[in-house]
């Protein structure tokens, strides 16, 4: 099974997303998505997200900034192996936001949830952002009334 991580990065009421590269070895080229990547063998998912954010945005995170909130299992004809993706929320500081340097992907965008809904997005990354926004940040009930 292939493991990966994704970061729902937020600052105030805005989310930091990326436009994915058009490189041929990238899944979902040219779509929007969250920052993240593969988990190395023997690596814990929380360490992986901190490493990936350092590699992609050149910022250092405190270990406690990464808060696990969702795991999505993916079994698709488009992938040779089943996949699992772990999502972490990352509330960033103004200093971290201002010091970011994009190292991977085409571009980064700090936008609100309404604009995110209008973009062509990696399907499970969009699900993770929407779930986080409505059921964790806004604390809507998941249970039936």
Region roles according to the model:
Residues 17-19, 23-35:
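N-terminal first-folded block
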Residues 25, 29, 101-145:
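Nudix hydrolase/Nudix homology domain
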């Amino acid at each position: 099974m292939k493991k990966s991580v994704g970061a729902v990065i937020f600052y105030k009421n805005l989310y930091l997303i990326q436009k994915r590269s058009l490189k041929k070895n990238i899944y979902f080229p040219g779509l929007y998505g969250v920052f993240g990547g593969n988990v190395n063998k023997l690596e814990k998912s929380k360490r992986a997200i901190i490493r990936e954010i350092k590699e992609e945005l050149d910022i250092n995170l405190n270990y406690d900034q990464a808060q696990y909130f969702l795991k999505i299992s993916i079994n698709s004809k488009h992938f040779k192996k089943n996949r699992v993706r772990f999502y972490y929320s990352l509330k960033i500081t103004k200093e971290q936001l201002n010091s970011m340097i994009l190292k991977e992907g085409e571009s980064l965008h700090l936008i609100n949830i309404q604009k995110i809904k209008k973009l062509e997005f990696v399907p499970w990354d969009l699900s993770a952002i929407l779930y986080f926004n409505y059921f964790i940040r806004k604390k809507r009930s998941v249970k039936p009334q």
